[in-house]
Design a protein with these regions (language model features):
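Short, intrinsically disordered C-terminal tails of secreted or membrane-associated proteins
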Residues: 576-584
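Short hydrophobic alpha-helical segments enriched in small aliphatic residues
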Residues: 463, 510, 520, 529, ...
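Basic, short loop/linker segments at the boundary and entry of helix-turn-helix/winged-helix-like folds
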Residues: 22-64
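Anion-binding and metal-coordination hotspots
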Residues: 2-5, 70-83, 93-500
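Residue-identity detector for glycine
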Residues: 451, 455, 479, 493-495, ...
Length: 585
């Protein structure tokens, strides 16, 4: 007979959390990341009396959902949270709770959140949690900038003429101090110049994009990414008419001051200046930057540079030593002047072709930081350089591609430098959360069986405390049966007894292929703690403190652990073993 759906109203009790799949992204984020720090950041901006406000953590999570799932409109975001159970659960709303109005976001953002610098602090708090989990080590970093169009029309473009003070280009305070101590340094005289800048009437903070084939009004987003798992460690937003090479050193210095490790960094050709090379050295970073082929280098005329002497060697073997700094009056930039000492050039047979008749010695002008410039060029073409360039293309350029395609910053929707920075930080935070939880779950090989073994809440509290997380990935062959059982285990103490596995029988599913063995999940014992064992082949890969030297199964088989090797998972030392052949006792 034909069935009909009953429309009668029924009252039921529902646990919202039970409706969210174990593998859902928001469930992973909720278990791995704590947002309680937001209460401490915003406490000074909420009065102690009065009617309670909307929970700021719930509102912050709503904004994150918008950038995680590409929901650009805040009106639509409120509708999606109203309808989507997973979104409600993640934000802490029950089914009968009222969702905040879309206007609440704009009022709260301008009145409280922008004053507290919440988004910048929240971004670095997430990065700090990634560092504590071992997902960021700074061994391979990449930085790049990307131009993002602003939300303005072509008719709003205007040319604004401003008066600015022309001064020495400042890259880094320590670099400026080092330059001022060199011979020949003279601070250029203060000079007021008039500059014309293209911007928009509707968004005066934006600037003109003139980069390759890109044209328009927008912003420059500068970002640094750790190539281990693609976690973005720093995001800054500037007007589009700023130069990347001038901004990069202070961008990196801010991250180092916040405790972000950074040892090797890959950059593109746009950062190829002597000041950037020297600034990276002062920051303790090894830089990998493609070399620009200049049209008129000293090497073209047979000169070579000797880094030990800090001198150029002419074709006749005479050194041109460093003499002093020369300042260009038109640009305010400094150049290192190398010249021949004495009258060696006057007796040289190549003098007529080397320089004009009025001169008495040959000079070579180079970058004010040429020694660091040369050291950076020495790394070009090495295996490390090629590897870093590949990582830069994957993680730096790839991250910008993902941010623009999936996380709402293909175009800046709000207006003003503060609002543009907020958008870029939220998008970067959303990408970091995705990569963070996926990396941790990939490390620990977590499946739903973990919840039945030791409980998700206790397990993730265990992980977040950065304790030892021994994880057994063992492979064992039981006759012709290949079983796979997998989940993390609790810490087994040093000197734990043998692992005892309950003997299992093949199970038939009664359908096609009957007689084949099904994968089953059975708990085993390590010391006094329950864990799970992954069984697949006759080789074992075990992560566990030392002291456990062999397996003993209930059927009487033994396997000796060999090839002990230390590894690091989530910043925690673990030991990986491989077993020899399984034998009967």
């Amino acid at each position: 007979m034909m069935g009909r759906q009953s429309r009668q109203m029924a009252m039921i009790f529902v646990d919202i959390e039970s409706l969210i799949p174990e593998t859902h992204l928001l469930r992973k984020i909720e278990r791995m990341v704590s947002f309680d720090f937001i209460y401490d950041l915003l406490a000074p901006y909420y009065p102690a009396t009065g009617r309670p406000s909307v929970d700021p953590v719930s509102m912050f999570k709503m904004l994150l959902i918008g950038y995680l799932y590409g929901i650009k409109s805040e009106r639509r975001l409120v509708e999606e949270v109203q309808l989507n159970i997973a979104y409600r659960w993640f934000c802490g709303f029950e089914l009968d709770d009222t969702i905040p109005n879309h206007s609440t976001f704009s009022k709260t953002r301008t009145r409280k959140w922008q004053q507290s610098d919440l988004f910048q602090k929240a971004f670095y708090e997430i990065v700090k949690q990634c560092i504590d989990s071992g997902l960021i080590d700074g061994e391979a970093m990449a930085a790049d900038g990307s131009y993002i169009p602003a939300n303005v029309s072509r008719e709003s473009w205007i040319n604004v003429e401003t008066e600015v003070e022309q001064s020495m280009q400042s890259y880094l305070d320590s670099l400026d101090e080092e330059l001022s101590n060199q011979p020949g340094f003279k601070k250029p005289p203060t000079k007021i110049v008039r500059k014309c800048r293209t911007t928009s009437q509707t968004d005066p903070d934006s600037g003109y994009i003139n980069h390759g084939s890109k044209r328009g009004i927008g912003y420059l987003m500068e970002a640094t990414v750790d190539c281990k798992h693609g976690i973005l460690t720093g995001v800054d937003v500037y007007s589009a008419n700023e130069k990347e090479s001038v901004l990069i050193l202070r961008h990196l210095e801010r991250q180092i001051n916040l405790g972000i490790p950074m040892s090797r960094l890959a950059l593109d050709r746009g950062y190829e200046t002597g000041a950037v090379h020297r600034g990276l050295e002062l920051l303790g970073i090894t830089g990998y930057i493609p070399a620009i082929q200049f049209s008129n280098p000293p090497e073209k005329y047979g000169f070579s540079y000797d880094p030990q002497l800090d001198a150029f060697i002419c074709p006749e073997g005479v050194p041109l030593t460093y003499h002093r700094l020369n300042c260009s009056k038109s640009t305010g930039k400094y150049l290192r002047c190398y010249q021949v000492e004495g009258d060696a050039c006057m007796r040289c047979p190549k003098r007529p072709s080397c320089f004009d008749k009025a001169g008495i010695r040959r000079r070579v002008l180079a970058s004010s930081c040429y020694p660091a410039f040369f050291r950076g060029h020495q790394r070009v073409g090495t295996p490390e350089y090629l590897a870093m360039m590949r990582l830069r293309k994957i993680w730096a350029e790839g991250s910008f591609s993902v941010l623009k395609r999936e996380h709402c910053i293909s175009r800046i929707r709000k207006r003003g430098i503060l609002a543009a920075t907020e958008e870029c930080l939220l998008a970067a935070m959303a990408l970091n959360l995705k990569r963070m939880v996926n990396a941790i779950f990939r490390y620990l090989q977590i499946y739903c069986s973990a919840g039945t073994t030791m409980g998700f809440s206790s397990f993730f509290a265990f992980v977040n405390r950065s304790l030892i997380v021994p994880y057994l990935l063992s492979y064992w062959r039981y006759g012709d049966d290949k079983r796979r059982v997998e989940t993390p285990c609790k810490a087994a103490g040093v000197g734990a007894p043998n692992i005892e596995l309950p003997q299992q029988r093949p199970v038939s599913d009664g359908t096609r292929g009957a007689g084949k063995k099904k994968s089953t999940q059975q708990p085993i014992t390590v010391g006094n703690e329950n864990c799970w064992l992954r069984l697949k082949q006759s080789r074992a890969r075990v992560c566990q403190p030392p002291g456990l030297q062999n397996f003993q199964y209930r059927n009487g088989c033994h396997a000796t652990l060999r090839n002990v090797a230390p590894h690091c998972i989530l910043g925690t030392p673990v030991w990986i073993f491989t077993t020899g052949a399984i034998r009967n006792s």
